[in-house]
Structures are given as structure tokens and as C-alpha cells.
């Protein structure tokens, strides 16, 4: 009987070891896939604009995968893939028109600051994180969607998004944000 109990104990010990090893390895792999690159800039922007740092990381993760030299086919630049026209407009909004050129968007510190400022602008303008994320991708057309009962039942929340690219984008950002919270900002990490 003690031999059978010993075998059960050994199997349980192996199971506990493998489970721990698997969880530890999975956590490390997840953190490699969801890094906290540019943490100084992200944490500063989160504080300055009262944004969840997990949201900023999620936008960067989705937009550029943290590549400071990223440039889209339509001309969006930097880690937060900001359009030069938006960057110029934001400089005017902040009273520093012409301080930077569009190539300054390749500087992660500048791009994260202005990208986060834009995200906060949309959050304040629309009042919900989901609408702010959609607007970060599609712009002020979100106003039309919120005023259309096909897309918003209450005029405040998007029930659906008519642009498949934007809907996919919002889903990716929300999923990435959940991972950042799980990996870095939850009590269990």
C-alpha cells in the first residue's frame, strides 16, 4: 500500500513541478510577446494624461510592435503610428505649432507623448475607451457612427463598428490591453 501511495505522491510532485514550470515559461513567453518597452515614456504619458498605461502599451503593441521606425503605407509614423497631419494639428492644439517635424515621430518619446495626448483627446471627446480606440484608428467618423442607431443604441457606446479594419483594430487593442493588465498590472503577477 505504501508503494501505491508513494507512486501517487511522485505523480503529484511531477504534476506540480510541470505545472509550475509551464506557468513560469508561459508567463515569460507572454512577457516577451507583450513587452514594456519605453516604460519611462509610457508611464509619464499615462500620468500626464490620466490614461491606463496598459492601454498605451496596447496601442503601441498593435500599431507598431514597438518599432520606432515603423511607417505605414499611408504615411503613419513611429511607435504609435501617428499621421503627420494629426501630429501637426496636435502641435497647434498644444500651442507649439512647428516645434517638431514629421520625422520627429520616429523618436519614441515624442511619438508616445503625442500619441497618448491624442488618445486622451479622443477619450475626453467621446467619453468611452472603446470609442477613443476606434477614433485613434478611424478619426472623427466615430461621431457619425455614434449618431447612427445601426451602430450605437444610445449615442455614447459603439454596439458595432462599420469598418472591418477598425473593428479588428479595436478588438486587437482591447485584447492586448487585457494581456498587459494580466502580465503587469494585476495583483497575481
Language-model segments: which ranges?
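Intrinsically disordered low-complexity regions specifically enriched for long asparagine
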Residues: 9-12, 173
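Hydrophobic alpha-helical membrane-insertion segments, chiefly the h-region
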Residues: 11-21
Amino acid at each position: 500500500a505504501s508503494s501505491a501511495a508513494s507512486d501517487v505522491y511522485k505523480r503529484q510532485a511531477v504534476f506540480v513541478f510541470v505545472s509550475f514550470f509551464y506557468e513560469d515559461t508561459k508567463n515569460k513567453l507572454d512577457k516577451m510577446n507583450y513587452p514594456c518597452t519605453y516604460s519611462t515614456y509610457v508611464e509619464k504619458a499615462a500620468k500626464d494624461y490620466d490614461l491606463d498605461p496598459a492601454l498605451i502599451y496596447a496601442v503601441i503593441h498593435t500599431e507598431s510592435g514597438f518599432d520606432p521606425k515603423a511607417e505605414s503605407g499611408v504615411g503613419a509614423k513611429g511607435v504609435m503610428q501617428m499621421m503627420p497631419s494629426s501630429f501637426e494639428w496636435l502641435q497647434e492644439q498644444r500651442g507649439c505649432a512647428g516645434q517638431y517635424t514629421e520625422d520627429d515621430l520616429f523618436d519614441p518619446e515624442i511619438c508616445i507623448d503625442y500619441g497618448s495626448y491624442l488618445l486622451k483627446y479622443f477619450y475626453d471627446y467621446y467619453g468611452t475607451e472603446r470609442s477613443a480606440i476606434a477614433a485613434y484608428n478611424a478619426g472623427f467618423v466615430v461621431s457619425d457612427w455614434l449618431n447612427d442607431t445601426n451602430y450605437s443604441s444610445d449615442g455614447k457606446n459603439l454596439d458595432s463598428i462599420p469598418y472591418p479594419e477598425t473593428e479588428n483594430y479595436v478588438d486587437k487593442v482591447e485584447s492586448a490591453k487585457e494581456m498587459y493588465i494580466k502580465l503587469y498590472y494585476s495583483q497575481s503577477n
